[in-house]
Amino acid sequence: MQQIYTVKEIRSVAARSGPFAPVLSATSRGVAGALRPLVQATVPATPEQPVLDLKRPFLSRESLSGQAVRRPLVASVGLNVPASVCYSHTDIKVPDFSEYRRLEVLDSTKSSRESTEARKGFSYLVTGVTTVGVAYAAKNAVTQFVSSMSASADVLALAKIEIKLSDIPEGKNMAFKWRGKPLFVRHRTQKEIKQEAAVELSQLRDPQHDLDRVKKPEWVILIGVCTHLGCVPIANAGDFGGYYCPCHGSHYDASGRIRLGPATLNLEVPTYEFTSDDMVIVG
């Protein structure tokens, strides 16, 4: 039958052993008995390989160093600059723009001053042609835009009026509507013609001879709007037998010239044309 000696018992024996006490006290050992083992037996584990996720890159010092540039080193040394080392890339393809360059400057060993005038002339020619084309296109665009704002054909048709002169008796004045304004057409007598032709220009506020206001002496065509504040004068009235403005008392003669009152200008003469002895077109 085996016995198990404890540590305390071994130490007590070593203490009583005399000169061998230091040796015996420095060593202690447990002796296993048959009843219970001191240390449980361990079963060796089977080693397993670690499984890596191949979808994700494995970053380590070795993998990162493998991606570094591995090219010949180029060192540059100068007197006034510190030494430097850089990596030289020999796999870079420099683009060639020879197809887009002019023939005169393809040769790098040839001076470009010899072809300066020719190249400048070509550039000026292209610029001039482009400028003319842009100006022509802009002119057409502006013309079309301005013409779109002009009056239409039906409006232009109303801008002119035909008047039959045989409907106006001698010594009478007829009023028409033209462009939204009253239009006076007066058939003057010989007495009125001589009277207005004899008026001296020094007596007029707005000097103008009678022959300068008519194309035919017997016909006077005027716009019936007072030049003072825009009232409509009355025909065959006033101190001079022509037109009278009842608003502020302006007097005009038979030629439409201002003679008295606050108005300062003569009645306006529109543009007209005699197409025949019996027809006139105003506008």
Swiss-Prot record:
Cofactor(s) required, per the database record: [2Fe-2S] cluster
Q: Topology in the membrane?
A: Single-pass membrane protein
Q: Where does [2Fe-2S] cluster bind?
A: 226, 228, 245, 248
Ordered alphabetically, the record's keywords are:
2Fe-2S, Disulfide bond, Iron, Iron-sulfur, Membrane, Metal-binding, Transmembrane, Transmembrane helix
Which domain of life, per UniProt?
A: Eukaryota
Q: Where in the cell is it found?
A: Membrane
Q: Which GO terms describe its biological process?
A: mitochondrial electron transport, ubiquinol to cytochrome c
Domain Rieske, by residue range, is: 196-281
SS bond partners: 231-247
The residues that cross the membrane are 116-149
Q: How is the cofactor bound?
A: Binds 1 [2Fe-2S] cluster per subunit.
The UniProt entry, under PANTHER family, shows:
CYTOCHROME B-C1 COMPLEX SUBUNIT RIESKE, MITOCHONDRIAL (PTHR10134)
Similarity remark: Belongs to the Rieske iron-sulfur protein family.
Q: Kindly provide the name given to this protein in its UniProt entry.
A: Putative cytochrome b-c1 complex subunit Rieske-like protein 1
Source organism of this protein record: Homo sapiens (Human)
What's the source species' lineage? Answer: Eukaryota, Metazoa, Chordata, Craniata, Vertebrata
